[in-house]
Amino acid sequence: AVGVAEGMRAADTALIVVSGKDGVCVGTEKAVEAATKAGLTKVFFVNGLCDESARFYRVFESLKATFGPSVCPVVVPYIVDGQANTYVNLFDYKAYEYGTDGSVKQTALPDMGDRLEGLREAIKEAVAETSEELLDKFIMGEEFTPEEIILGVSQGVKDGTICPVFCGDAHNTFAIDQLLNSLTWLAPSAADKSGEIGVDLDGEPVDVSVNDGGAAAGIGFKTVSG
């Protein structure tokens, strides 16, 4: 737990990996607590879905039950005969099929029945938490526009009111591209954070802000003395 907290001190976003087999555990809750305390954006990644014993949808419901309506699905698996080779992006409504040889191709959107609509509803529920205006619209049963959903999720992730959920398999790199591509516009950049307070050579406090033209600066953590 101490190591997690130290790492978050130097991070802009906390990527919290959850086992697709074991689900939410004490470590998950401690990681969320540490990220919240550090004021970081929180992103969940449900991993290990190539394991036939993995149960993504059970884990997703556990995340919602534990952390509330802020948990928002972004990428979900389409599972056939225990195999999760196809992943659906709920934002662009596109499906991608992955191979163990590293190949990936767009494929037809699978028929997921009522489950897909339920997941879209979870997104709307999360977006409704981001502003009074959107909450009123949600309560009145009005549909969000695509722009409202994208902007709502983006802003909600940055201010911490939405925790997006991605999934895949790190070992086979399934859906890792969707996670990384989405983080480029979902997660806050260093420029979105407030500056750090450092000390100059005389030991006096100095504000260190993000500046492309400024001197190089970094945060040291988990160092070993001696």
Task: Name the predicted role of every residue range.
Residues A1-G226:
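Structural and coupling elements of P-loop NTPases
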